[in-house]
Amino acid sequence: MASRDDLVYMAKLAEQAERFDEMVDHMKAVAQQPKELSVEERNLLSVAYKNVIGSRRASWRVISSIEGKDTVSDQLPLIRDYKSKIETELTDICADILKIIEAELIPNSTSEEGKVFYYKMKGDYHRYLAEFQSADERKTSASDALDAYQLASDHANQDLPPTHPIRLGLALNFSVFYYEILNSPDRACGLAKAAFDDAIAELDTLSEESYKDSTLIIMQLLRDNLTLWTSDQGEAEEAPGNADGTVVEDL
């Protein structure tokens, strides 16, 4: 069996080769060991799953768009079967990482930063499920995402400074959840604006350059979303149903 160091090294190689399914396998093996993940290992795990889920989320959006434009075609059953296949892959990936988060990562985490990171991650993957589910399944995933994001926020607000990249990334994704899943633009804008304003107030206290760069990048994403969402609200008031904003989230 490969050593922990070898698994991490192979995950880095897989990342460079853009073989993210293999990167997931390596980091999953690391995560299932009893020792708490280091910051580097935690980030590698996140990048691996983010890429395997991200490509399929993008595929699902493309196929859903085609399905919406081709409602009377003879090929519609083929389109729907293909979309269903992608949804199965999305479900399996989300179930896989959520099991690891619940069974290994949260119980083994000893730092508040780690807990915020993993609860945020839990919220993210329940949100990804809610993106394509319907009826009761969507309601359950949305509720689970909300609970996880709220727990992450409770820990972050108590233990991380407003300029911390993980706290800002949480605010970014939590606000996207309010906007996209709960259809609550006011809550989304309020959360994003509060996070941005709180970070601005303490920006001068940052010293470490790499930390500052990450903070500024996420703050820009928050501001981009605020600009987009407020614009969408104005357009929706003028022409209901025509707003089609694309939101951004952290990497």
From Swiss-Prot:
Top-level lineage group:
Eukaryota
Q: What Gene3D superfamilies has UniProt attached to this entry?
A: 14-3-3 domain (1.20.190.20)
Q: Which Pfam families match?
A: 14-3-3 (PF00244)
**Family, per entry:** Belongs to the 14-3-3 family.
Q: What is this protein called?
A: 14-3-3-like protein
